[in-house]
């Protein structure tokens, strides 16, 4: 009876857990699979959108792109070279696609959906303007969209976001740790009111403050630089981290601190050698929060940074990879996958500390 009772319990648990996991993980699956799909497959709505396809749903031929001769090209033997990152254009309509053909016996891959190649019309052959001289087969799945990111400032944006996040973490920890300890342990008039006021400042929407902050960074002449973000982000990471760490410091038994003081330690030595090792999970939790918030923040980065090279990753992706109402979904999803890796790594390496820190800080 006990065995079947446990089986029913597991089945019930998984019956609720599996739909939740599917709902939570589906956006990540969709982003990953989209980032590896060729454009031809990505916009072929007749195919299964949840996996890769090799052939066009209408023609049942492999996905390809036609290579055409520009109208200005002379009628002469052609040595056709495709440069890295160039996009080819189809000369036919979707209703009447031309058959796939190769030039000679060459297997030609697209520099957009494959590797860099060159195409040469056989000696003596001529091609009229706007003639289709060949096709390039489209690889699917493909790493084209990831290669395309190398031709954009994507990795520069990643560097700016990482440097900003690291600097904000350092400033937040250096200020929030002593502030939280002082409010939690030292007795002075108004410390409770100050603690509540610090937390209430976190509840103010950051979007309300970006206009006065823009005047502030302009007065310091750090606008359009990474320093405008490094000085702004701590204003909404420090209040929450201070409030969070106050709970950790209050959870440390006072007897430990009193014994350290009796042994001759100063207040700073006691904080550094005794208290901080005990509340390290809370400090890591605060650091993760500060890094995640600054790495993903959008409004301040869009307002303070105007140059392409100094943009943060969220702003750069949304501004540079969207043209009006045209969305380059392949590169967008590839950048989303790569852009999420730093946060995934940070959470993955410190997941136990983060869960312990959030639960302990909330309870204490």
Predicted regions and their residues:
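A structural signal for multi-pass alpha-helical bundles of membrane permease subunits
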Residues: 2-93, 98-364
């Amino acid at each position: 009876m006990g065995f079947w009772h446990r089986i029913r319990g597991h089945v019930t648990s998984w019956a609720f857990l599996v739909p939740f996991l599917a709902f939570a993980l589906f956006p990540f699956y969709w982003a990953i699979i989209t980032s590896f799909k060729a454009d031809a497959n990505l916009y072929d709505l007749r195919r299964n959108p949840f996996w890769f396809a090799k052939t066009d749903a209408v023609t049942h031929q492999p996905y390809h792109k036609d290579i055409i001769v520009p109208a200005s090209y002379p009628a002469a033997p052609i040595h056709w070279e495709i440069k890295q990152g160039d996009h080819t254009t189809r000369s036919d309509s979707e209703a009447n696609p031309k058959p796939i053909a190769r030039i000679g016996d060459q297997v030609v891959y697209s520099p957009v959906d494959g590797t860099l190649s060159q195409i040469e019309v056989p000696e003596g052959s001529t091609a009229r303007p706007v003639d289709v001289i060949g096709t390039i087969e489209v690889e699917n799945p493909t790493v084209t969209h990831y290669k395309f990111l190398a031709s954009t400032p994507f990795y520069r944006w990643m560097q700016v976001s990482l440097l900003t996040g690291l600097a904000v973490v350092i400033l937040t920890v250096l200020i929030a740790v002593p502030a939280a300890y002082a409010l939690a342990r030292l007795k002075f008039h108004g410390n409770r009111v100050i603690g509540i006021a610090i937390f209430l400042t976190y509840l103010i929407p950051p979007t309300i403050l970006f206009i006065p902050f823009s005047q502030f960074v302009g007065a310091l002449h750090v606008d359009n630089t990474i320093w405008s973000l490094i000085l702004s982000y701590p204003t909404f990471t420090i209040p929450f981290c201070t409030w969070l760490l106050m709970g950790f410091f209050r959870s440390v038994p006072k007897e430990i601190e009193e014994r350290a003081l009796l042994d001759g330690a100063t207040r700073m030595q006691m904080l550094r050698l005794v208290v901080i090792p005990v509340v390290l999970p809370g400090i890591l939790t605060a650091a993760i929060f500060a890094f995640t918030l600054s790495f993903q923040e959008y409004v301040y980065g869009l307002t303070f940074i105007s140059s392409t090279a100094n943009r943060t990753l969220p702003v750069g992706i949304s501004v540079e990879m969207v043209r009006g109402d045209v969305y380059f979904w392949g590169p967008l999803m590839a950048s989303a996958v790569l852009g999420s890796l730093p946060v995934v790594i940070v959470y993955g390496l410190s997941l136990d500390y983060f869960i312990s820190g959030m639960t302990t800080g909330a309870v204490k």
